Design a protein with these regions (language model features):
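Select subsegments of transmembrane alpha-helices in polytopic membrane proteins
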Residues: 27-36, 121-126, 192-202, 256-259
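Topogenic membrane-insertion module of multi-pass membrane proteins
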Residues: 1-98, 263, 267, 271, ...
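C-terminal membrane-associated helical module and adjoining short loops/tails
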Residues: 1-22, 181-300
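Multi-pass membrane catalytic core of lipid/isoprenoid biosynthesis enzymes
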Residues: 28-33, 77-84, 88, 106-172
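Active-site His/Glu-centered metal-binding helix of metallohydrolases
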Residues: 37, 95, 99-103, 120, ...
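Hydrophobic, well-structured mid-protein blocks that either form specific transmembrane helices
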Residues: 152-198
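Helix-coil boundary and interhelical linker segments in multi-pass alpha-helical membrane proteins
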Residues: 41-88, 131-156, 208-226
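Hydrophobic alpha-helical transmembrane segments of polytopic
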Residues: 31-34, 86-90, 157-164, 201, ...
Length: 300
């Protein structure tokens, strides 16, 4: 609806109703760019020495924050404190990734450019970052003799996560440009994603880092097996077309809301009961839940 003297008197120069003020795009874009920056920091810290933990610890020390951070954590090991700081920054970026879409919708500022910007940020924070972190972990396990000799040469396999993220995000960007009729989940409001979402890779490898950081001595020698899953089955799941559930359509189907609620409760219980390893197992349950939901769900 056109309002004001100019709009009523000179319709030709009035702005169309669909024009969104430019400032409305910036809150969501800022969250997306924070996610991009957080992912870049994680990449830098992981690649600085391929010795996870020391680079973020030295970064904190250069700012004069390390002692205070270790005191907050109650941690006396610099490397562990550095690992936890890396995870905090990384997960803060992922939180921004969760919020940017909701903020864009709330501001009425959805658009193809925002979707593409989100994909570029995810390529760094959920593709390059887990690939670098995965390589650093695999090299650590190789150096300490945790990995069997037969697979010790596979330390570059985590790069498949980057390739899968690039493929998946390119597909998402194409769908965003083509319009709602081609969006992920093919119109089925029970599913939010086609294939595992790229941020799942960040959560998976962050969970492995967290578990490894909490392991005393060689208490988690078997983690390399989960690492191998994270650079083989995980990338395959990302590029697949298997529908996956999410929270975007919460409230539109009470039965599915109940199923997701039960799963979230179970995930929380396992994470609390088993600690960091429980968190990794909870993450593994996500694609399994999506597969079961897709197999036994009935289309409306």
């Amino acid at each position: 609806m056109r309002e004001g003297f100019i709009g009523i008197t000179f319709p030709a120069v009035s702005k169309p109703d669909s024009v969104v003020p430019g400032w409305r795009y910036w809150p969501a874009n800022a969250l997306t760019l924070i996610n991009l920056g957080a992912g870049a920091l994680v990449c830098w810290w992981a690649a600085s020495e391929f010795d996870l933990g020391w680079a973020p610890a030295e970064w904190l020390s250069s700012l004069g924050w390390l002692d205070a951070w270790m005191e907050v954590l109650g941690e006396d090991k610099r490397r562990v404190a550095g690992l936890i700081w890396l995870l905090v920054v990384w997960m803060f970026g992922q939180l921004c990734d969760v919020l940017d879409g909701a903020v864009a919708r709330a501001m009425g500022a959805q658009g193809a450019q925002g979707a593409m910007l989100d994909s570029m940020a995810d390529l760094v924070s959920s593709g390059l970052a887990p690939a670098f972190v995965g390589m650093a972990l695999m090299m650590e396990w190789q150096a300490t003799g945790v990995m069997p000799d037969g697979v010790a040469s596979f330390t570059v396999l985590p790069l498949t996560v980057l390739m899968a993220a690039a493929w998946r995000l390119a597909r998402f960007s194409r769908q965003a440009v083509q319009g709602p009729e081609s969006q992920e989940s093919n119109g089925d409001k029970r599913f939010d994603f086609e294939g595992l979402p790229a941020p799942f890779a960040a959560l998976f490898w962050a969970g492995l880092v967290w578990t490894w950081a909490q392991c005393p001595g060689v208490g988690c020698d078997g983690l390399w097996i989960l690492g191998m899953l994270g650079c083989t089955l995980l990338p395959l799941g990302m590029v697949s077309s298997l529908p996956q559930v999410g929270l975007k359509h919460w409230g539109q189907d009470k039965r599915w809301d109940a199923m997701r609620g039960v799963w979230l409760l179970a995930v929380g219980s396992v994470s609390i009961g088993l600690g960091p390893l429980g968190g990794v197992l909870a993450l593994i349950s996500y694609p399994l839940f999506g597969a079961i939901a897709h197999r036994f769900g009935t289309s409306k």
